[in-house]
Amino acid sequence: MLKLRKVAITGGLSCGKSSVCRILKELGAYAVSADEIVHHLLSSDVNVSQKVVDLLGKSILKNNQIHRSLLAERVFQNYRLLTGLEKILHPAVYGEIEQQYQKQQDSKNQFPFFIAEVPLLYESDGAKFFDTIISVVADPEISLQRFKTHTHKSEKEFQSRMARQISPLEKAIRADYVVLNNGTLSELQQSLRELYQELKIYI
């Protein structure tokens, strides 16, 4: 059986990682999202959720469930708590990604390759788990506008979050492929159709 290529999609804030992941999935790849895995872990994994509550306290609970906005408020201005949270979540996320990958690898392998959207790939030392890295980049002004439109948060919040990440330029330098996402959706789709065909060639 041929090895299923494992691809990570990463990049800066509001650069279009989810759009790239969605388009490649529509073209035929198997896709998972670290953010969706985190949501599942916090809502359904008793072991992980209890560790998070032990770290952050019951103030992050609403109706006895972890509320993500309350969690965010608790950690994003506290480096110690944020680091502690990441130490809980990152191994659990990579464990779930690997489980899903092995399930596809052990099946009839109907997908041409496996992709995982991992925003903090380099920050969490996760590049070693993947065969290929794609970094999505966009001009800072475009990313800022997308961030403000989608989250209704301020430029200050955007800059604060960006400051906690490796720069988009550094992520692009480290990656195997770079996808520029400054234009229209149709332009992005066209560039990804070409990349998709290249990624399928893997032995």
From Swiss-Prot:
Top-rank taxon, per record: Bacteria
UniProt-listed GO biological process terms: coenzyme A biosynthetic process
Pathway named in the protein's UniProt entry: Cofactor biosynthesis; coenzyme A biosynthesis; CoA from (R)-pantothenate: step 5/5
Ranges where the DPCK domain occurs: 6-203
Cellular compartment(s): Cytoplasm
One MF term in the entry's GO annotations: ATP binding
Keywords recorded for this protein, A-Z: ATP-binding, Coenzyme A biosynthesis, Cytoplasm, Kinase, Nucleotide-binding, Transferase
Listed GO CC annotations: cytoplasm
InterPro entries: Depp_CoAkinase (IPR001977), P-loop_NTPase (IPR027417)
Transmembrane segments: none
Assigned EC number: 2.7.1.24
Record-stated family: Belongs to the CoaE family.
Function description: Catalyzes the phosphorylation of the 3'-hydroxyl group of dephosphocoenzyme A to form coenzyme A.
Name of the featured protein: Dephospho-CoA kinase
Organism, as annotated: Protochlamydia amoebophila (strain UWE25)
Lineage of the species this protein comes from: Bacteria, Pseudomonadati, Chlamydiota, Chlamydiia, Parachlamydiales
